[in-house]
Amino acid sequence: MKVILASASQRRQELLIRLCDEFDIMVSDFDEEKVVFKNSIDEYVQNIALGKAMDIKEKLKEDAIIISADTIVTLDDKILGKPKDEEDAFNMIKLLQGRSHKVYSGVVVINTKKDLILKNSVATEVVFSKMNDNEIRKYIETKEPLDKAGAYGIQGIGGIFVEEIRGCYYNVVGLPLNKLKTMLEEAI
């Protein structure tokens, strides 16, 4: 059966290759702003991922396995999504530096043939080293932080500022592979 990744993220595409030899990419038009945060961060990221997957499901004319994900960063119960601009990125990194934060990914796998929907989430704790304003600005000049939740990429230059991680590394990159592997085995 065809596998579809509902994401434009290059990082997610690179990670999924480790689990699937072949897959197609379809980018969802789902408006993440429609999802309202209620009580649980886990539920919130799962609902965003579900919205993306359902958007793709509605567009399909054939059966498929659909994979979608959403990743956010939280600090002191505040959600840090992708920065709006360089100043927003600076402020996010300034908040994170020298502290511990959590990265949450919601993952959804849909088997349209079985009409099966699996939802899950993974949380990883990340500790950032202390950084001065000059280090933060130099990092932002690379443009790496601008399209990433929490304004950093652990798999890129941003990784040099990570002091410690507790949990799934791939979750911080954007696709928790171990959890996804288990979900795919259940879906197929």
Swiss-Prot record:
Pfam families: Maf (PF02545). GO terms for cellular component: cytoplasm. It comes from Clostridium botulinum (strain Alaska E43 / Type E3). This is dTTP/UTP pyrophosphatase. Keywords: Cytoplasm, Hydrolase, Nucleotide metabolism. GO terms for molecular function: dTTP diphosphatase activity; UTP diphosphatase activity. It is found in: Cytoplasm. Its cofactor is a divalent metal cation.
